Amino acid sequence: MERALVNLRRLVVTIVVALTFASPAAAASIHITNDSSMPDAEIADALPAFQRALDQDFAPNWHEARGSELVLGEAPPGAWEIRIVNSPECLLCSGYHDLDNGVPYAVVSTVDDWQVTFSHELWEILVNPYLDRVAIVKPKTLTRVYALETADPVEGERFVYVRPSASGKPVQISDFVTPAWFRGDSLGPWDFSGATKRPLQLLEDGYQIWLHNGAWDALYASKGAKAEGRAKARRWNLHRRTIAHISGALAG
């Protein structure tokens, strides 16, 4: 245990000393490709709601997302992409975001509430596109390294909100945490919907990926979130996202 604590302290010092704190800008355009059986018209109808949520809700809190535009259609080489599929190639998840030859992309399944999954992955790819950003957080007297993922801590259908589609239909939008959520002494707001009552709080189905004894693990608020959180941690470990890969940190 003592050795693990020493290693963690060394890791934190390395991150704080070596890393830049600048936020990467998101792509000017994120292309939405439909590889599912869902009609293109359904996606096109919902797209203005996602764009409005991005511009009016998310970007004012996470400035790196400013100016990003959602475009329905095939992605040219090198473009960021969100792929909508019938079933994702991942265990215990309805969506995920990753890199394809260094290019950020996300996959969204139509199996569950695709609108919530879409906005969840959108929020995360905008802030942590290369899966290399972390937050140095200090719950109580501890110091931890959290993956900078903006929708996982407040995951859950109870916490979604609604924006109108082009035709006026309600589109469900995932809640997201603000930068203040990662700062233990902040006054808030800590998430867009106002569901969290303190920094670092995990809501009922929420989880958080964190660095534990040199490997990525998951903190979770309930048994229901345990499986999904640990599945995501396994994906991070599979890609060996360790200190060698981390390039940007948010101080807590």
Spans of model-derived segments:
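Zn2+-dependent metallopeptidase catalytic core
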Residues: P39-L70
